[in-house]
């Protein structure tokens, strides 16, 4: 219901503003949210997390492009570099049950949230390895 209302221009700005105030007041801005086929541990005060919660998707064009490429090349593994809350990894794990995913993010808070997401989605978590460090071509 909220995801549909958030597409109406007036509510698009009103819902996040009101929600942030309410959640701050009750100190309940973090928790598990059902995002289509899986649960994610998200923080409503984080702008990316908030977009995922309200729209039930994130970067739809990029995700579709990536899914098409993985399908075309019949990929066996996927490197999610800068995984943040794990949305890309979770979507890929759902779409490609046979693929192995290696997710990297140097941010401890992002890894904490992604780790909580993996705990809640045990079947999916078997395909994903999460690492709390960044990858770069520089030392």
Predicted regions and their residues:
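Phosphate/nucleotide-binding beta-alpha loop and adjacent structural elements of enzyme active sites
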Residues: 1-139
């Amino acid at each position: 219901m909220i995801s549909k209302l958030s597409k109406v221009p007036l509510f698009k700005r009103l819902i996040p503003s009101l929600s942030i105030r309410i959640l701050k007041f009750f100190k309940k801005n973090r928790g598990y949210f059902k995002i289509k086929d899986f649960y994610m541990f998200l923080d409503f005060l984080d702008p990316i997390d908030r977009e995922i919660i309200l729209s039930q998707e994130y970067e739809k064009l990029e995700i579709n492009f990536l899914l098409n490429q993985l399908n075309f090349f019949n990929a066996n593994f996927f490197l999610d570099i800068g995984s943040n809350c794990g949305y890309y990894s979770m979507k890929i794990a759902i779409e490609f049950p046979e693929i192995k995913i290696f997710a990297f993010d140097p941010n401890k808070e992002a890894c904490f949230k992604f780790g909580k997401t993996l705990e809640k989605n045990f079947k999916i978590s078997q395909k994903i390895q999460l690492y709390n460090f960044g990858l770069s071509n520089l030392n």
